[in-house]
Amino acid sequence: MKSLKNLLSLGVAAALGIATFASTASAEAPSDVKEIKAIQDRGVLRVGVKNDVVGFSVKDPLSGEYTGFEDTLATLIAKEIGEDVEVEFTAVTAATRSELIDSGDLDCVLATFTITPERKKNWDFSTPYYQDAVSVLVENKSEIHHLKDLLGKTVGVSSGSTSAKALVQAMIDNKILDGKNFNADKFDPATWTEGVKFHQFDNYPAISTALAANEVQAFCVDKSILNIYKTPSRVFIDEKFAPQEYGVVTKKGSGLSAFIDGLIKKWLADGTFEKLIKENNL
């Protein structure tokens, strides 16, 4: 939908200082790769991003512009494909990002998309560009301090995320749950009731609102995302768990996959990512 998209020209990106992060030695995009040629002919790289994750990707409600680490990264990728290629951002959630790749509506997704063995069976992931860990945010008054204190509680998670499974696995690893009924390949937060229950939401602000209203007693997702919803009346439990590596996602077998992976490796090596992470306070 056009209302969820924003065109950001590379000229504007350069004015914002994005070009200073790019390597002066630019890899030439192979025009004989059909997916890359299609982007060059179109003049637009279609990218799925979050619109509410501070530091990674946020959409300004007035200007419609996207800013953040992943938005800058998308612009750098577009610049490598072609000097005149623009970025068309589409807001996605954990529940919608993969289907928009499958349908061909997006060329790639940069949306705090965690790399897992299961997901790699269905989509291509680049080398990780950021690592985080899952944590749990609670209200101070809840007296929830540890994983074990979540027994009997309802936890808010994002639909389509891996947070619920990671939490249950951590509780099993810490011998809080016996895990007899846990199957990682078939895990479904909607039907899991052993020790802890889950309520799935379409977006993070909805989980935060539910936590404030005590509709859920905990908010579980990656720590960098939870930091956005941390207030003086909220605390993190003591444990962090399940390291989460984020990668650029493309359709399985896409000719774009190897090209993007090469760029990620180059920028990891030349210090580009270190600068971007500092710039976005991550």
What are these regions (language model features)?
Residues 51, 130-141, 191, 223-265, ...:
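Periplasmic-binding protein-like
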Residues 44-49, 66-67, 148-178:
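Short loop->beta-strand "edge-of-pocket" segments that line small-molecule binding or catalytic clefts
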Residues 38, 138-155, 178-179, 258:
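Flexible hinge/capping segments at coil-to-helix
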Residues 32, 87-99, 142, 181-209:
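Short helix-initiation/N-cap motifs at beta->coil->alpha
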Residues 75, 79, 86-149, 233-240:
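Acidic, polar ligand-binding/catalytic clefts
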Residues 27-111, 270, 275, 279:
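Extracytoplasmic small-molecule ligand-binding "clamshell" domains
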Residues 28-42, 162-195, 227, 231-240, ...:
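Ligand-binding clefts/hinges and TM-proximal coupling segments of bilobed small-molecule sensing domains
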